[in-house]
Amino acid sequence: MRWISHTMISASLCAVWQPALMPAAVLGATAPDWLEWLGRRHLPLAHAVHRGRTHNLLAWLLLLVLGWAGQPNTLALAAFALGGVLHWFCDALTVTGAPLTWWSQHRSTLFGGRLRQGGKTERALAWGVMLCCAAL
């Protein structure tokens, strides 16, 4: 999915839960991509593939549990991790899929991975989530 779809979906869902934490959720929703970008330029991940180590579900779920367990002091961390989890789910809806763990190169898809990046279905999903959340 494109960054705007990740942003719309995470911001909308976080607005229903904790509106004040929307910036953390948006930062988390875009984190797999900007962490990968930073890693390719400044860390020893120069040969990292897209949707690799920064895109695995297990790491984001562990971070979410840590953020949730320490509440109320760590709710921003939970929102950040929620954004990362939502990023994974959105990417898993696409044809390319996303990895469950950092040690596996297998990419999982949800519902057959039918979405194409930037396509009409992706935009419809992002707008649909946003409108449903706005209605709540």
List PLM regions with ranges.
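N-terminal membrane-targeting hydrophobic helices
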Residues: 1-136
